[in-house]
Amino acid sequence: KTIEKLQKIRQFDFINLDLKEFEKVEKIFQNHKIDTVIHFAAFSQVSESVQKPMKYYMNNTVNTANIVRCASKYGVRKFIFSSTAATYGEPIFKSDSQQTITEEFETKPINPYGQSKLMSEHVIKDEAKVNSDFKYVIFRYFNVAGADINYKEGALFPRIGESHDPETHLIPLIVKTALKKRKAITIFGEDYDTPDGTCIRDYIHVDDLADAHISAIEYLEKNESDAFNCGYGHGYSVKEII
């Protein structure tokens, strides 16, 4: 339904395939003159990545290498990649007053999901070193949340927002609990070194994240490749969100 709605706004080719099928991926680049790639495709459940690491390395890292290889070979000039703040692992702050993770922090992931994304970043950066026409923006997302606040039922454009199956993200689980679609919300861990003892996370609204990707395309017209954090620079604890 989303694809059908989008095609009413502007016609485009929708091709459904697995990025591991390199020859099929390459054929897309051969048959279309592509200037920009925005690469979202990935698995993203941290707990699952610990249990099934190879699933994440194959899908997230190897498949990213496939699309980077094709993009560089067939003249793509702008490559936007959705990475994750999980690449930072457990950051060490220099002082109690410092609570913001910046791009200068060491990338030291602590799970296969974060590792698979960091390895993908290296694939992109290494290719850019040998192909000066291949520019990239890497976005390290913090916790993406929310839904399009301007959406109206029956609108021509599709609604964007959180939709996971199974649902594991905090804000949707809280909302479902409030709507009595769940019995309760469970807090895991109340002994963190934070004011209320619960984990603090930075968030970013889906609308702002979408805008960031458009800005990245424009950015690469005049600037060199770079990596950016995608968050608001301040966090909220689990109890604060509730």
Model-derived features: positions:
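N-terminal Rossmann-like NAD(P)+-binding domain of SDR-like oxidoreductases, especially those catalyzing
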Residues: K1-A147
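C-terminal substrate-binding subdomain of Rossmann-fold SDR/epimerase-dehydratase oxidoreductases
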Residues: K1, L170-I242
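Short-chain dehydrogenase/reductase
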Residues: K55-Y57, Q99, I110-L118, I160-P172, ...
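Short aromatic-enriched loop/helix-cap "lid" or pocket-rim segments at secondary-structure transitions
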Residues: T2, I92-K94, D148-R159, C199-I200, ...
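Short, functionally important structural connectors and interaction interfaces within domains
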Residues: Q11, A42, F93, Q99, ...
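Gly/Ser/Thr-rich beta-alpha loop segments that engage phosphate groups in nucleotides
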Residues: P91, S116, D148, D191, ...
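A generic fold-level signal
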Residues: Q7, Q51, N59, N131, ...
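Hydrophobic, Gly/Ser/Ala-rich alpha-helical and linker tracts in large acyl-processing enzymes
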Residues: D148-T168, K176-T177, K183
